[in-house]
Amino acid sequence: MKNLRSQISLVTQDIFLFADSIFNNITLFNPNISIDDVKKAAKEIGIHGFINKLPGGYYYNVRERGVMLSEGQKQLISFLRAYLSNPRILILDEATSSIDSKTEKLIQYATSKIIQNKTSIIIAHRLSTILNSDKIIVLENGEIVESGSHEQLINIEDGFYKKLYELQFQKDELIGEVI
């Protein structure tokens, strides 16, 4: 069972952080992961800059549950944690909820790096996080109503996914115009 668990990483919308350094929260106190390993991985997925800007950088001490960090910053730490574990299976459960658009772009970049050559299950309301998925399964009221690639689903006349996509991206365009 331990071997199976070591092959799966989970990134959820509710990230738990220990009252300890960013480094220890990323490595989960694994003595086999060095600061150089962490920095290299952070650079690979594009989040080194955010961590380096914190007072003390990787040794910045967070309070329990990360109360001094934004939701997006906690998500980025969780992504780096998952990336370092190099799982065979990655589960992202609403990993981009409660974040701003700048952090979402960072997370999308990190996601593209993390999911390479892995089985990935992405549970999302933000369709921007799943556009490049091989297969999208669309649920409505707990029932599967459509499945396929983004291109296939967007071309279904009166499709549920197509309606969601149009609503979501129309809203994003309106927000962009207001800002």
Report residues per predicted region.
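Short adenine-binding "F-helix/F-box" segment of the Bergerat
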Residues: 1, 35, 158
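ABC-family ATPase nucleotide-binding domain "signature/switch" substructure
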Residues: 5-14, 22-25, 39-45, 59-156
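DNA transaction DNA-binding modules
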Residues: 15-19, 32-35
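A short, conserved alpha-helical patch in the ABC ATPase nucleotide-binding domain
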Residues: 26, 30-31
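Conserved H-loop
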Residues: 48-55
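C-terminal boundary and immediately downstream tail of ABC-type ATPase nucleotide-binding domains
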Residues: 156-179
